[in-house]
Amino acid sequence: MGRRSGGRKLPFFASNASTSSSTKRTRSARRLPSLTRPRASSSPSPASPSPPPPSASHPAPPSPPLAVSPAGAGKVGKKKAGARLWMRLDRWGVSETLHLDKGSIIRRAGLPPRDLRILGPVFSDSSSILAREKAMVINLEFIRAIVTADEILLLDPLTIDVIPFVEQLTHHLPLKNLVCGNGQPGGDDHGEKHDDSPGDQVPRLNEATGAEHELPFEFQVLELALETVCSSFDVNVSGLERRATPVLEELTKNVSTRNLDRVRTLKSDLTRLLAHVQKVRDEIEHLLDDNEDMAHLYLTRKQLQNQQVEALISSAASNSIVPGGTSLSRLNNSFRRSVSIATSMHLDNDVEDLEMLLEAYFMQLDGIRNRILSVREYIDDTEDYVNIQLDNQRNELIQLQLTLTIASFGIAVNTFIAGAFAMNIQSKLYSIDDGSFFWPFVGGTSSGCFMICIVLLWYARWKKLLGP
């Protein structure tokens, strides 16, 4: 059995087995140019076909540069320099986290580099909503994202403040009513059904702009972002209101350094929160004042325009009626004009939908701002009340000081009289030895000084320098 199994080797492999490993490498290296010789020297006559090469029946091994080694695989998975963590979520609910650098983001979303600086740490405290050709840049407090017509790229999705926004995105996506051409059979307003036409592969513009009650993908993301930011503001304002009530009541009862420091911290937090709310409110107000900016935020409409124009051009190019390139260019211009007219019919409605969305959150932010201002007014009223208390105490101290000054003046007059008679001068009063003059004199001077104090106090009350 061993002999038979050993004797079944093919002659080709038997000859290869007898050669060395270096001969194998040499033959395999020589075989590569031999594959191209018959093709280069093959004659056009079919009478003498060239025999196929020996290696034609066997698939050629892959080229060495395409083979990925384990070390190469580790380099591919390594994080690039300057890359940041992003989460990608499309309208169908498919999400993934990946590290992307600025160049990848610029190529993916078609944004200029200056827009990515807005999402950097330098402008982290600013609030802005920018509309570009293919994307919308959202920088609202802790939410920094790039939204296109089909997906959202969220920066730093694992932070504590951004996690509620991620949960809302995953809860609301995928969209309930996706406007796609291949999802439902197409039909126009006259009941005609389109079969096997390129226009069926593209969403219809009237369905995406006017007929759908559901907002486009980018507006839904914007709504969730504004809702998350407003909810965060609401929670912070509620916390400040709960903190403010006991602190201010304690301050009215006891004006101490500790209570004043607590009120100072509360007031600084309130001022900082008011600044953040005011920034978001001003950005929404800026968008509401400019209808053109709101129209540029409609990314789905732009995408549908481009897709419809491309579909109509491709269908016209495949039509045999079109004779040449000149007619095709004219037809291209006519198609673009027709699409622009169709989109302008729905432009006001789209802007109205976005305007209603922004006005709702503008009113909510305005209400949050009014709550902050009411708490601030409460703090100001408490400070005024404390200042009134301090002024009252200061007035009482001044009255006490005035009373003591008047009493000191009377005592000083009595002391002056006693000091004058204590001097070593000649007087007949010193010859009186029975003491009948001393006590009446002391009593008279003391009574006179007391009367002086009474007169001064009465004068101070008459001038309302002292309280009743």
Curated annotation (Swiss-Prot):
Q: Which organism is it from?
A: Oryza sativa subsp. indica (Rice)
Name where it mostly resides. membrane
Q: Where in the cell is it found?
A: Membrane
This protein's name: Putative magnesium transporter MRS2-G
Q: Which Gene3D superfamilies match?
A: 2.40.128.330, Magnesium transport protein CorA, transmembrane region (1.20.58.340)
Record carries keyword Protease: no
Lineage, top-rank taxon, reads Eukaryota
Listed transmembrane segments = 402-422, 437-457
The family this protein is said to belong to = Belongs to the CorA metal ion transporter (MIT) (TC 1.A.35.5) family.
